[in-house]
Amino acid sequence: METTYAHIKSALLLLAVAILTAASARADTYSWTNFQSDIPGVAQHVDPSLVNPWGMAVSPSGTIWVSDNGTGVSTLYHQDGTAVPLVVEIPTAARNRDVGNPTGQVFNETPFFQVTKNGNSAPAFFIFVSEDGSISGWNPTLDQTHAIIAVDNGTNRGVNRAIYKGATLGVANGHNFLYVTNFHTSKVETYDENFHQVNPNGFFDPTLPAGYGPFGIRNFNDEIFVTYAKQDPKREDDVPGPGFGFVNVFDTSGNFLRRLISNGELNAPWGLALVEDGLWVGNFGDGRINNYDPVTGAFIETLMTADGTPLEFEGLWDLLPLGDGVFFTAGSPTKSTAFSASLRKIKIGEHESGSSRIACTAFGIRPNANLRGKCCEVHA
């Protein structure tokens, strides 16, 4: 797990054009525009905090919150790509001597999942999980610019070490629960409304091959979708590779329902989104977005560029459908830089179905192989 970011180089929001080639031979056009960068003159706006943006959540007002894994903060954006003048610092686990490293996050609209500071408690409106084993929550009445630790499993060592990669919320038997992917222990952890861990035997798939850990997680229509990535020898980070991945579906009580997708086009999958009638699965491993039937898991298509090559965003993380758009986040494999992009899709040609449009935002980078582990170059 990489937690040192000595060479933060660039973050960028951009717009371009691509074409999606589907199995039905329909033609879909994508375009995107430069919104944000930490390099002056590259985009419309500059944001030095946008480094390895990972999970996203949206507030009731429509503001997008982004977990910046590389800088240990959450940055906020309007849906037109402009920044909101609030940066929330994500706390670290007690053993973490570096900056925070948030990954997944969720918006909490319940009165539960309270955090406490100076003897005062309030519900965490946003909940963050981090690679250092911490879970934190933010409520502006307690601290406007800092999230507050709710769970610190960063002190766990050995087989019980916690490395959190994703989170989602759900309701089971009338109670609210937080579900967190612990990549190191190969378990999905469940927390009750008071941040107490429960259901230790839930989310078990007896047929899952050894060496895979839960990676991304989403709640779709009261079913918990979990992606799995191949683990490195220390079980800290994913190992990319063609076919390295699975997607399972559980109920909100942690009971296994079905294996949805096995291997195939998966490559360290993390991002999940229901878009139109399909399930978009974003691969961190190769940066591709694949579309599947959300019920059967049947492969439908890979999003393609105009020249017939797969549309790729290096280090692709989250997928967030919002309004008429799907927002993407991505960061470098070295986690030292990132950029964002807005992507708009318009259906064209004789296979056009209605007049629907999808606008998308993507955050991605292409690393310089010679600088791996130090810094990355951005290639538009």
Mark where each language-model region is.
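Bacterial N-terminal signal peptides that target proteins for export
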Residues: 2-12
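Aromatic (phenylalanine/tyrosine) cluster motif
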Residues: 5, 339, 360-363
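Serine residues within intrinsically disordered or low-complexity segments
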Residues: 10, 353-356, 380
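Bacterial N-terminal signal peptides
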Residues: 11-21
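Short, threonine-centered small-residue motifs that mark membrane-proximal processing/anchoring sites
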Residues: 25-28, 360
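Sequence/structural signature of beta-propeller domains
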Residues: 27-350, 370
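Cysteine-centered motifs
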Residues: 360, 375-376
